[in-house]
Amino acid sequence: MTSYKVKLTNEKEGIDVEINCPNDQYILDAAEEQGIDLPYSCRAGACSTCAGKLISGTVDQSDQSFLDDEQIKEGFVLTCVAYPTSNCTILTHQEEALY
């Protein structure tokens, strides 16, 4: 099993932490296991509560059903259904930025 370093950051929320996340675990789940409190609601990729923005790196969020192609191209990611596929940095708490 491969594990990646995922940096979660949001200056306004006081978050600047790096977690280890296996490539078969959702980023939200890994963050919670490591004591990081991130927003979530459905945990199924069907809403935008957990939205973040990918600053660097790559993720697999093929399980999501909410974001459109343009939002994905802009780097938005649903942490509840995103697996890291490389080391990455995610700006958290980005639900409002979607609209």
UniProtKB/Swiss-Prot annotation:
Q: Where in the cell is it found?
A: Plastid, Chloroplast
Domain 2Fe-2S ferredoxin-type: from-to ranges: 4-96
* GO MF entries: 2 iron, 2 sulfur cluster binding; electron transfer activity; metal ion binding
Q: Which Pfam families match?
A: Fer2
Q: Which CDD domains match?
A: fer2 (cd00207)
Q: Name one GO biological process term.
A: electron transport chain
GO CC list = chloroplast
The UniProt keywords, alphabetically, are: 2Fe-2S, Chloroplast, Electron transport, Iron, Iron-sulfur, Metal-binding, Plastid, Transport
Which portions of this protein are annotated as coiled-coil regions? none
The role this protein plays is: Ferredoxins are iron-sulfur proteins that transfer electrons in a wide variety of metabolic reactions.
Name listed for the protein in its UniProt record: Ferredoxin
